[in-house]
Amino acid sequence: MITLQINKVPTLFIKPFTAADVDAIVDFVRNSASLYSGSASTVLFIDTPITTATVEAIEKLSSERFRVVFRDHHGIDGEPANDREGRVVAATRKLELLLGSDCRITVRRLHPACSTLVSVGEFEDAVAIVADRDADGLTAAMKAAGISYPELDDDAAKLDGEPRFQVTGSHISQLLAKGMAVLPSYDSSKPKEREESQQRLFADWLKAVSGNKLAIERLEERVLLYDDAVKTSETLARTGVEVAPGVVLVDTVDKPLFDPGTLDALLENDPGCRITVVRKSVGPIAAIHGIQYSLSVAKRYQGKVNLHDLVPVDAKSDPEAGIISNVSFLLHTSADVWNNQVLPALRG
């Protein structure tokens, strides 16, 4: 998890999945409240995945003196297609019943970025903000706390979109996107390395938005790393192998740092490529299972291909289970799930 003060508002960036995550959220809010000098009791959850852990944390905080406001765009668009989506719908209903008008859950189609769900400074007096630990969570939290710039909403939508479009926003947005692209992947032998690097990136970017020259210089150093990663991606793209009709796999195990957005874009230049797969030894699933397979549906096929169809309908999105998937066009699995479920399904 990452913690920052954004315009004096304590902010926690976290993806809640476990009981430990619930405790971390509740403890963070309680600690923030103990240092809070205002009279408000509001805690904002924004761009937070609608998981069982998220609901549990909100239930605990609501049972205390806190007024919880929930804003998010991870709702299910239409009828649930599988058990995972069914659980999201059930959790959504729980939150709506618990929070009433303080709960606003929409879908990405209507709100590509969560920053569009708040006005500038709407929660500048909040006790705390809890957000997803990605660029969309950061931009939404900073806007809620009172820091913004003219292109923020458009930039946020790109930052939360496909990797290849994340670097196409304003110059300040590109500094964040390229910095995110070259963060060290999660390594179980150095479990804090990625988190600490991301915390420094977020802190520098917030300063850069306000014009801090030293922070901008540090971000531009990350851009040099990004440029090298792009070159590596170009080399890796030439090693792609079709493992099923329209499915191209690239093995990046023990390879230098690469940019996923560039790699995907190069692979998708082939009109027959429906799904890209990256095999890697780092990431939240790899940290537990050793190897991780990351699948992404090519943009032109996203209305036709649902990756949730490749795993059992009752599959749980959890690194321990070897599956992570919050949207239909992205799926991360362990080697066991890939070999025994996903690859056979792709080959039909």
Model-derived features with residue positions:
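Eukaryote-biased recognition of electropositive, low-complexity segments
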Residues: 190-193, 198-207, 212
